[in-house]
């Protein structure tokens, strides 16, 4: 099959700034109660745009390439994070912490029928990672907007991901160990990567 990979639209989030030059990531982490609803909508819109662009690209390729049409070649879209992840983890977490009020949360959830009428998510690959490892990677990434994120926030994100994806009978979920460091030349990590790829192919 042909594979299209959709990356996190973080460049879009960083490109929109206020009069003081602060971008959306920065103001969100500084004041979640003020910016949670706005940022979650931005995340939804930018992810949806990338997904729809990918679908339009597939339709164009299929239309132009007669062999794709004759052979019925399949396309697989792999998104860095599902829009449903935003809905079931980040937005719900912000609602439960009172950073997003009831009216905002209700309005936010009204967006999703627009997406789900066009797109059906088939599978989820969950790279389950210890919060301390995620925090370590976030610190190493050294993104200026994320420097004040506490470990507690990462632990909450992990908790909500686990609640949604572990033992979820409504979605096909492949849970993989995300704690391995695949950027090193360690033979054990390379073998773990090979095993992980094999599981994904079987999935």
Predicted feature residues:
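Conserved substrate/cofactor phosphate-moiety recognition/catalytic segment
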Residues: 2-40
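Hydrophobic/aromatic beta-strand patches that form the interior of the parallel beta-sheet core
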Residues: 6, 123-125, 172-176
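Conserved nucleotide-binding/hydrolysis micro-motifs of P-loop NTPases
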Residues: 10-13, 83-85, 129-134, 180-182
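Short aromatic-enriched loop/helix-cap "lid" or pocket-rim segments at secondary-structure transitions
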Residues: 16-21, 89-92, 136-139, 187-189
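Glycine-rich phosphate-binding loop used to anchor ATP phosphates in small-molecule kinases
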Residues: 34-119
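Short glycine-/polar-rich loops that comprise or flank the Walker A/P-loop
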Residues: 74, 118-123, 169-172
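A glycine- and Lys/Arg-enriched "phosphate-lid" helix/loop adjacent to the NTP-binding pocket
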Residues: 87-159
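NTP-dependent small-molecule kinase module
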Residues: 135-203
């Amino acid at each position: 099959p042909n594979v299209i990979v959709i990356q996190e639209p973080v460049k879009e989030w960083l490109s929109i700034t206020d009069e003081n030059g602060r971008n959306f990531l920065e103001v969100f982490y500084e004041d979640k109660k003020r910016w949670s609803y706005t940022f979650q909508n931005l995340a939804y819109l930018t992810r949806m745009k990338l997904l729809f662009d990918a679908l339009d690209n597939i339709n164009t390729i299929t239309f132009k390439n007669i062999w794709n049409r004759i052979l019925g070649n399949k396309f697989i879209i792999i998104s860095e994070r599902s829009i449903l992840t935003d809905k079931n983890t980040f937005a719900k977490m912000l609602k439960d912490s009172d950073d997003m009020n009831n009216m905002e949360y209700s309005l936010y959830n009204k967006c999703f029928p627009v997406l789900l009428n066009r797109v059906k998510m088939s599978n989820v690959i969950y790279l389950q990672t210890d919060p301390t490892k995620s925090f370590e990677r976030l610190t190493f990434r050294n993104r200026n907007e994320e420097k004040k994120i506490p470990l507690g926030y990462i632990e909450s994100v992990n908790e909500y991901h686990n609640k949604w994806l572990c033992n979820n009978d409504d979605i096909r979920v492949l849970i993989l160990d995300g704690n391995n460091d695949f950027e090193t030349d360690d033979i054990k990590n390379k073998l773990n990567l090979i095993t992980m790829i094999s599981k994904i192919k079987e999935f």
